[in-house]
């Protein structure tokens, strides 16, 4: 399961700065879908091959009535749900009573906690960090979040238990005490150039696996009723797979020879209905379920307007690149006029996910539930279907013939060839000249062209653009071996002619 890292600390210690730096590229993926609401407190990030969820808990002030009463409930929830806590303090401001109150609470939780002294750029880092030893943490780590100094190394240490390579030993100083991480390179989320070999590994990993289906949505939309309907119809023996108390319930089942694993989340509460703690717990469970799923089934209540929280859940699913099916529940009992209004509203607000199948169902009575399987399978097949380089290149050239790429700095962008870069979601890698300069409008055109030509339904498509290297670049006017030989022949011919 994907790890969750929580940023904890009093206001203005740099939590948001660190959050924005670490999640900036991953968050940008949502921008491909205009009109989508993004929750900025929760972000996906990736360090090497390790994906993780980062939570900005907001500021905590425990100075007046004690940390248990003054902490925001969502921050408490995030601490409980997190696998790792990064406790941030301000190296310039020094130790405060709020820091001490927060540290006391964190020590009582026995959670893997890293004390991070931020804002040490331009000052004596060791001197600024010394007083924070009073907080009783086993180690003190030093970073400058605004410049990214030490961030990568800190994350490597925090995520070491979840990564294949443990890097803690190589980063420990001679005394094994204060680890100054600022000498290491800045945190950069560079895009890895994906190859056909990467795609084949991805494809092999997905073979002979059950379809993992996460059923998500706010409470009272009928999610539990739908799960019971599905399991009741299939007459399967239900048992809970091993997991921690904070994980979702995994339920294996089979239908018509196809194996599934249903991931039952706790749902996401709307603020005002219940307290913040339960809501935040639910968000984290849902995020982890989405990451672990192949296909996400979002359940929406037909009798309530689609909410920003519904759109935020969609954003998480799209950001994770998951296949998507949408079920509009409680459709029975609505008159035709109301149904038309609901359809119109859904078309208006869900236009950016027109690739997802939309079903109108009644989980209580079973109406339309059977058709969900068809869309789930269609989405999964689309997300994992192997497509060869020749086919992808042919489709790319057809798109280029139909609509030429624009000019960039007086030169026409040239698309050379395309190949698969991964699956679930399908990732297409396009090579060419100046392809990274293509405008968003042309990238969307290519995405839609591939979708239509390859009949991909139910899953987002990602395209990575790689500039082809010029084999003559940086040669400084040097001739190739064949050119050198030709030059010698020409010089020899001229000399012979002059002798005559």
Swiss-Prot record:
Keywords: GTP-binding, Nucleotide-binding, Repeat, Ribosome biogenesis. Residues 385-469 form the KH-like domain. Residues 486-500 have a biased composition (Basic residues). GTP 2 binds at residues 217-224, 264-268, 329-332. Pfam families: KH_dom-like, MMR_HSR1. It comes from the Bacteria. GO terms for molecular function: GTP binding; ribosome binding. Coiled coil: none annotated. GTPase that plays an essential role in the late steps of ribosome biogenesis. Belongs to the TRAFAC class TrmE-Era-EngA-EngB-Septin-like GTPase superfamily. EngA (Der) GTPase family. NCBIfam families: GTPase_EngA (TIGR03594), small_GTP (TIGR00231). This is GTPase Der.
